[in-house]
C-alpha cells in the first residue's frame, strides 16, 4: 500500500516515539526526511540521526533528545501543507511559531530552511511543518 503523505508519517512517528520516551525511531529513508532531521538536529529538537542500509532501501534512525529529568525537547509537531491543501508563504509573510520560540520548516527553491533562515535570505516557499 502506498503512503499518501510520508512527511506527516515521519512527524507522527517522531511525536509518538517522543511521547512514549523511546530513545530512537527507525523510519524509511528519503532525502526530504533526512533534510528535516538535519534541521531538527541543528535547532536542538533531536540528538542525532543516521542512515543505515536495510534489506530493502535505506533506514533513517533518529536519536531522540530528552532533558536531565526526562523532559521532552520536542513539545509538539504539526503538519501544515498537506497533499490535499498546499500552504505557501511569501518571504514577507513567513509564519512565526509561538512568537519565535518554535520553528517553521519551509521548502524553498534553495532547499529546506527554517522560517528565520528563509526570512534572512528573502525567499518564500511551501510551509511543511511547525515544530515547538
UniProtKB/Swiss-Prot annotation:
GO molecular function ontology, one term from the record: structural constituent of ribosome
An example of a Gene Ontology BP annotation on this entry?
A: translation
Name assigned to this protein: Small ribosomal subunit protein uS8
Q: Cite the record's note on assembly.
A: Part of the 30S ribosomal subunit. Contacts proteins S5 and S12.
Q: According to its UniProt record, which protein family does this protein belong to?
A: Belongs to the universal ribosomal protein uS8 family.
UniProt-listed PROSITE patterns: RIBOSOMAL_S8
Indicate yes or no for the key word Transmembrane: no
Highest taxon of source: Bacteria
InterPro entries (UniProt xref): Ribosomal_uS8, Ribosomal_uS8_CS, Ribosomal_uS8_sf
Write out the function statement from the record: One of the primary rRNA binding proteins, it binds directly to 16S rRNA central domain where it helps coordinate assembly of the platform of the 30S subunit.
- Between which residues do disulfide bridges form? none
Per its UniProt record, what PANTHER family does this chain match?
A: 40S RIBOSOMAL PROTEIN S15A
What's any one GO cellular component for it?
ribosome
The UniProt keywords, alphabetically, are:
Ribonucleoprotein, Ribosomal protein, RNA-binding, rRNA-binding
Write one Pfam family the protein is assigned to.
Answer: Ribosomal_S8
Amino acid at each position: 500500500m502506498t503512503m499518501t503523505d510520508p512527511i506527516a508519517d515521519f512527524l507522527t512517528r517522531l511525536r509518538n516515539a517522543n511521547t512514549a520516551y523511546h530513545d530512537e525511531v527507525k523510519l524509511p529513508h528519503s532525502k526530504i526526511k533526512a533534510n528535516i532531521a538535519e534541521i531538527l538536529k541543528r535547532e536542538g529538537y533531536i540528538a542525532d540521526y543516521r542512515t543505515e542500509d536495510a534489506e530493502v532501501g535505506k533506514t533513517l534512525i533518529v536519536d531522540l533528545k530528552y532533558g536531565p529529568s526526562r523532559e521532552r525537547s520536542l513539545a509538539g509537531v504539526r503538519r501544515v501543507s498537506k497533499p490535499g491543501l498546499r500552504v505557501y508563504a511569501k518571504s514577507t509573510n513567513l509564519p512565526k511559531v509561538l512568537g519565535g520560540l518554535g520553528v517553521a520548516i519551509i521548502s524553498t527553491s534553495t532547499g529546506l530552511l527554517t522560517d528565520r533562515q528563509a526570512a534572512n535570505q528573502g525567499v518564500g516557499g511551501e510551509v511543511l511543518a511547525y515544530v515547538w
